[in-house]
């Protein structure tokens, strides 16, 4: 069989799937990875990388679909780079996600635990509480667009005003803003040249309270009066309640949403969400689970895994705005949360006051550094790290604490199994595993693991 070459387009039969939602075909006994493809499909894909150990290809067309496949409800599916599996019935999505995660556990030789299944999202559509949209154009020099990056493209932006993973308030805000700026002839920000004005639109909406926060992100390269746009956005008849409109000045070179300066154009600079009877203040850049209803399910599982922590001290590492820690404080004697992002810690402290919680404290700093300075010892540790997992330095001290139990909440099962391997090498056993889907239509998933220290 001849060698496969880069940019060659050919037909593949998808035989397996690996995290995150990457279909696997075979060529000369070598794996061919095709993002978005699923087992049972026959697809056309263009080869993008040829390596000694693997081949990567980009999905171009589905030649034969799997039984039960449906027409995606989103008109931009396949063009927008956001969702990958909207054509699959939800039960099939869960089946594939479960298969991907359990394969990682099997490959890492992690076994002997109680597997508690996969829990689906309460909402399959309109579940997101935050979106970061980008200004741009779909065709270079074309009409202004506002939305998500196009599939397999670093620069084309798809206008996503019909997106069905957010509710109507998001859609009307996006549509209003893009139509307004189409009449103003203002330059979009060009990342490579570092010139332009319009960068991003951020919308946050608390699903349980209905509170809405809108932020327009621009550079300082144009002096433009936003009073008219502010009044237009205030006049909309929302399903929820508009609480604030912000103007974020971002002159940074990186292609990411951040702020050098934040100006409040209307109202306040935060919204409040309610999760499991507690209130949480969410500012523009606060980390908060993007599926509020799903978060309630996820946190309920975490609390179940914690078990009886009365008379116990719980460390909540990578605590963000302190959501899990504050929920755990209702059961624990004491909770100490540690988080790198100072703004998130300030929000966590405000949330403890909001909820009249007195047994929960938060420290800002690098987890790896702060835990070396804490004199108290935890009875239980909650780990909820970002996608890269627990840093090696932090892991050293997690192990040194010698806590009887660890509850690990992971948004990346690949780094999860790596970290579990380290913890197992130092005397911990994986007791329980539960998968929780927070992101229908996408390849992402959460996993909750209970570890117990072996008595030697």
UniProtKB/Swiss-Prot annotation:
The lineage of its organism: Bacteria, Bacillati, Bacillota, Clostridia, Eubacteriales. Residues 3-61 form the TRAM domain. The keyword Ribosomal protein does not apply. This is Uncharacterized RNA methyltransferase CA_C1435. The keyword Signal does not apply. One of its GO terms (biological process) is rRNA base methylation. Belongs to the class I-like SAM-binding methyltransferase superfamily. RNA M5U methyltransferase family. Its EC number is 2.1.1.-. Keywords: 4Fe-4S, Iron, Iron-sulfur, Metal-binding, Methyltransferase, S-adenosyl-L-methionine, Transferase. [4Fe-4S] cluster binds at residues 74, 80, 83, 163. CDD domains: AdoMet_MTases (cd02440). The active site is at 411 (nucleophile). It holds the Pfam family tRNA_U5-meth_tr. S-adenosyl-L-methionine binds at residues 289, 318, 339, 384. PROSITE patterns: SAM_MT_RNA_M5U, TRAM, TRMA_1. SUPFAM superfamilies: Nucleic acid-binding proteins, S-adenosyl-L-methionine-dependent methyltransferases. It comes from the Bacteria. GO terms for molecular function: 4 iron, 4 sulfur cluster binding; metal ion binding; rRNA (uridine-C5-)-methyltransferase activity.
């Amino acid at each position: 069989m001849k060698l496969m070459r880069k940019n060659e387009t050919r037909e593949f039969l998808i035989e397996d799937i690996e995290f995150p939602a990457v279909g696997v075909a075979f060529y000369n006994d070598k794996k061919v990875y095709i993002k978005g493809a699923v087992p049972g499909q026959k697809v056309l894909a263009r080869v993008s990388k040829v390596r000694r150990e693997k081949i990567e290809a980009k999905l171009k067309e589905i030649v034969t679909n799997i039984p039960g496949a449906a027409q995606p409800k989103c008109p931009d599916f396949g063009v927008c780079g956001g969702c990958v599996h909207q054509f699959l019935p939800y039960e099939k999505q869960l089946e594939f996600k479960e298969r991907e995660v359990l394969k990682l556990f099997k490959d890492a030789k992690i076994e002997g635990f109680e597997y508690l299944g996969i829990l689906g999202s309460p909402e399959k559509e309109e579940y997101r509480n935050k979106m970061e949209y980008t200004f741009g154009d779909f065709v270079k020099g074309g009409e202004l667009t506002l939305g998500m990056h196009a599939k397999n493209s670093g620069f084309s932006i798809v206008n996503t005003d019909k997106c069905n993973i957010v509710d109507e308030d998001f859609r009307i805000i996006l549509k209003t803003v893009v139509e307004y700026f189409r009449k103003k002839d203002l330059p979009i920000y060009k990342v490579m040249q570092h010139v332009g004005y319009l960068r991003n639109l951020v919308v946050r909406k608390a699903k349980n309270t209905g509170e809405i926060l809108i932020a327009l992100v621009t550079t300082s390269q144009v002096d433009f009066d936003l009073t008219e746009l502010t009044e237009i956005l205030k006049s909309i008849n929302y399903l929820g309640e508009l609480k604030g409109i912000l103007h974020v000045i971002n002159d940074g070179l990186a292609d990411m949403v951040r702020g050098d300066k934040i100006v409040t154009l209307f109202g306040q600079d935060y919204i409040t969400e309610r999760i499991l009877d507690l209130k949480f203040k969410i500012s523009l850049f606060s980390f908060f689970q993007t599926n509020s209803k799903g978060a309630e399910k996820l946190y309920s599982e975490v609390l179940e895994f914690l078990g009886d922590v009365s008379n116990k001290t719980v460390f909540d590492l990578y605590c963000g705005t302190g959501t899990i820690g504050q929920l755990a404080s209702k059961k624990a004697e004491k909770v100490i949360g540690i988080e790198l992002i100072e703004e998130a810690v300030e929000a966590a402290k405000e949330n403890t006051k909001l909820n009249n919680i007195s047994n929960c404290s938060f420290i800002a700093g690098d987890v790896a550094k702060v835990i070396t300075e804490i004199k108290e010892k935890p009875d239980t540790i909650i780990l909820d790290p970002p996608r890269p997992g627990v840093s090696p330095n932090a892991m050293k001290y997690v192990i040194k604490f010698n806590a009887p139990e660890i509850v690990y909440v992971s948004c990346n099962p690949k780094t999860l199994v790596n970290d579990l391997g380290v913890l197992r090498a130092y005397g911990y056993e994986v007791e329980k595993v539960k998968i929780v889907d927070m992101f229908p239509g996408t390849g992402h998933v959460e996993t909750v693991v209970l570890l117990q220290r072996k008595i030697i």
